[in-house]
Design a protein with these regions (language model features):
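Short, intrinsically disordered, charge-balanced linker/junction segments flanking boundaries
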Residues: 117-120
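Noncatalytic partner-interaction/assembly domains of nucleic-acid and motor enzyme complexes
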Residues: 1-111
Length: 120
């Protein structure tokens, strides 16, 4: 997958804020969950987080809490990956009140729709 086919095009902070938006905005998560693919993320930690959010949201119709993610994290046997996931969640949580989350959501929806059209 080419660089422009990944959310890395928008940078690390963008992806971190996207995770924050998914964790706190149920309506946004519902809107994008079916077209947001883990392959759009370069980082294995981000892919793991997105996968957990998708799985949990599909089953329970709400994003997982940090407590749920902490419990799921116990299944990760790779210490380096586990540390990376914890750090990513910390960084994401710092952005839950960012003033540009609406912009992040709009850009993500556009990106995912374009990727879906490309793949059709």
């Amino acid at each position: 997958m080419a660089q422009h086919d990944k959310l890395a095009t928008y940078g690390y902070s963008f992806q971190t804020k996207l995770i924050a938006a998914l964790l706190i905005d149920k309506l946004f998560t519902k809107q994008i969950i079916d077209i947001l693919d883990v392959k759009y993320f370069e980082s294995e930690a981000n892919s793991w987080i997105i996968s957990c959010i998708r799985e949990h949201f599909t089953k329970f119709k709400v994003a997982p809490t940090l407590e749920v993610l902490k419990i799921k994290l116990q299944d990760v046997t790779n210490d380096v990956l586990r540390a990376s996931i914890v750090e990513q969640l910390r960084e994401s949580w710092k952005h839950i009140e960012s003033t540009d989350l609406d912009f992040i959501k709009d850009k993500t929806i556009d990106f995912c729709k374009n990727q879906t059209i490309k793949g059709a």
